[in-house]
Each structure stands twice: as C-alpha cells, then as structure tokens.
Amino acid sequence: VTRDAPNVLLITADQWRADCLSAVGHPLVETRALDVLASEGMLFRNHFAQPSPCGPSRASLLSEMYLMNHRSVYNGTPLDARFANLAREVRAAGLDAVLIGYTDTAVDLRHHAVDDPALTTYASVLPGFRQLIPGSELHYAWGRDLARKGYRLPPRGIGADAFHEWFRSAAVPGGGPTFAPATYPAEDNDTAFTINTAIEFVRHPERRPWFLHTSLLRPHPPFLAPAPYNAMYDADDVPSFVTVGDREAEAAQHPFVAYMMRHHLHKKLLTAELHPDDRAARHQLRATYYYLMREVDDNLGRLFAALRETGDYENTLIIFTTDHGEDMCDHWMLGKLSYFDQSFHIPLIIRPPGSGSQGRRGHRIEAFTESVDVMPTILEACGAAVPLQCDGFALGDFLAGTEPPAWRDAAVWEMDFHEIGSGAPEHEIGMPLDLCCFAAIRDAAYKYVHFPSLPAAFYDLAADPGERRNLADDPRHATIMLAYAQKLLSRRMAHAERSLTGIQLTPHGPIERPRTDRLEPGMS
C-alpha cells in the first residue's frame, strides 16, 4: 500500500433494517449524517445480509464467504482458522487493521488450550484485528469510563443486559416498558463512548493510510435510550405493522414461522415481558428502536466532522452497513431470525474517496448486492488481491460510475436455527439437528425459501411485497417455484468452497486459474 492509497473506515451498526433511513423515505426516522453520506456516495437499495444472527453474519461480512462455506452457523459456532479474512488481508497489504468494537467471532477451538477463556464466549476478536476497545455489549471499557465520571456501577459479574438495565430510570406511567430513559445523559452513553474512541483515532493515527473498523452495538437491544432520544418520536406515529392479520393467521403461513413466533415475540425485553396483544408496548418498542438509530446517526455526524477537520475526509473510503436486519414486530416476530426481508434486507452506503466519482454521487444502485461484496470492495481499493475463497465481488464498477459487464440478478441468504443446548426445534417440530436450516433466493419478482425437512415457502413479491401469502401449495405457481428452486441450487453449486479447486499440481509445478476466470457474478 502506497502513502497515496485511501484510508478505509468500515462502520457497522447492529440490527439495522434497510427501510430505516430518511434517505429512502422513512416517515419517522431521521438519519441526517447518513443521508449526507449517501448524497456524496452511493446508496445500494437492494443489499442483503447472507446469514443471521450476529456471529454468522459477521463471519460472512469479514471473510466474504457464504454460510454454506464458512460454516460458522450460529453464535458460538467456531470459525475455521484456515480461512482468510479482511483483517489479515489488509494487514498483509501493509495496513494496520484496527478495530473499535467487536466482531462476534467464535474462535477455532482446535488452536486453543482447553482452559483458554476464549472458549467461553462467542465474542472474541477476528484474528488479524488490533482491538482498541471491546464492544459495548460487553460493557467493560465503557463501564470504566462511567466509573471515571463518577457513576455508581452495578455489582461485578452482572450480565450485559442487566448492566444496561441498572441505568434505566423509573417507569413512566403509560410509557410502555422501553420508554423510561437512561439515567446518564446522551454524551455518556455507549454509542458516544465508542464514537469518541473512533474520533481520537482518526485525529491521531499512528500512520497513514489507516484502516479502521468501527462496530457499534445499536440499535441492537437492550432497548434503552437516554433523554432526549427516548421521547423523540411519538409511539402513535410509528408505521403500522406488516402482518397477515392475527397471530393464528400468521402462524399458519409456515411451520417455521409458527415456531419462531413462539420463541421470538415472547422474549424478555430487559425487565418487561412484551405480550403479543400489547399493541401500545409494541408501538413504543418500535419508537425506541428508531431512537437508537437517531442516536447512532448523530454520533456518526460527529465522527464525519472530525474526519473533515483532519483533512482526511476526501481521502477516506467510508462504508456504512450492518450485520442483519430486525423484524421489529412485523409478522408478529422480534429479532432477526425469520426468513422475511426484514431480517436480511440491510443498508449499504459507500462514499468513495476523492472527487473522481462526482458523476455518481447521490445515485441509488438498484442491483442486488450482498454482504460478501464489502470485503472485495475494500481489498480492491487497497490494491490487494481478493482470495479465491471469496463468494462476493467488488463494487468498484458501480463506484466508478459504470455498470459491471455481468452482475447477479438475485440475492441469496441462509440461516441455521438449530440450538445445541436446548434442542428446541428438534423437540417442537421434529427436525434433526443438521436439518434445522433454510436457504432463500430473492429477486425483484419472487422469493423462494427452501427447507431440507419442512415445506418450501414462495412469495410473489410484485403482487405481495409484504409477504403475507405463501404460495408454495398453490398449483398455479408450481412451475415458477420449481424454476426458483433450480436457480437456488445452481447458485449454491457455483459457489461451493473453492480455495484450492482452481489449482492443479503438474510435473512443471502448480498451475492456477485466476479468480476472474472462475466465476462471473451474473451466474446464478
């Protein structure tokens, strides 16, 4: 990497839905800093995460591999140490891979002693990163900062949710379980603390160009916001929920939907149970989710202002995205473990460095992009080679203002929902452990979801964008559904793990086909 190469700032929020940006017309959420970033760069409207939840999704983002290849299928499933990753690749290119926050990596236990504390958490750091502070979900560094400021902390050893709940003020009558504000002001909260650390880094980097991955916890739970954010939006003004109708009608869509509804709406939200019939509480929960986004955006505005002050703003590749989405009570679900778009459709904003892309700035890219495209985009900007293992493709043509000669016409994603400890899906819906999974393919017209031991799901998105009617059993759609099943199978076959498959040992030594010869992104 030469000194005139750009800096790289990769920002990830956690659990941020694609529709929650004012730049795409959300009626309530205000994201002024991100709107400016989008106006100066490109907003990718059809960007999708590959797996969910956090650990598998970040494994795909940071290794550029589909779930079927990296196989870190759930929070706590080890990520094979043999795979290349973004941190190691940018370090090999001569950059210091700095992390502020977390990567939710479960380490490869084959390379650790049996008593290594790293084997007790899924929140280790991806190998190759130099972590400045841990993520605020672990709260240790932020807790020390609060203590220095004179706050009384909860007892040692308390869990992350309980740590946050310690700072919730008394319930406000009629406000719902997530309305009561934090007892600390906004400038002392975990998001501000993380961004303060990032600002300090960009003001005083050890060398240039630099690489910084800033990983923010919000708007992920706990659903707790300080004043004035806790009352910024009226719960009565939030958009209506996307549902089939009542809970029974929603559950009838598919056995997986019914199972997830049982497990992921009755979940505990800090100290209060969210009862499905408590509409006011659900509205307040959604408003609180929006508060946390506004809070993140305001703090990102401070970070971008600091970059401008240092003179580095124009020489920095800035990427904003997230790990996965959030159902937020649509389809009577909470969290990110459905097959609906709300769990997988996520934001991606990229601001290229310099002024060479003025002609494309402010453009909305409608092509289907995936989380696995982020790593090759960064490596290309750094002048580094993209490893053969990678399933995604650099977005450089889009950023340069040209259309790629070939590009995918659909997005795919996967999820594994087995539970090693409880075995809940095995007991409740009779699914063997290794069959608790699904794969989905979605284009502008249809979505097909395949389960190895449950019926498929199929939606006509043109007629039913809210995914309210599963057409899998409708004989009139059998032919088109089969075509999408074949399309999904073709995509999976084309992307089978191939780190070594393009190499052949010969009497004259190894020969290798370049990655660009191996797979065109237009292949499905």
Q: At which residue positions do the language-model features occur?
A:
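Short beta-strand micro-motifs enriched in acidic
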Residues: 449-451
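Formylglycine-dependent sulfatase
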Residues: 1-446, 456, 466-486, 515-524
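A contiguous, mid-protein "functional segment" used to position or interact
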Residues: 478-503
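Short, charged, surface-exposed hinge/linker loops at domain edges
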Residues: 497-515
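Residues forming the ATP-binding cleft of Hanks-type serine/threonine protein kinase domains
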Residues: 462
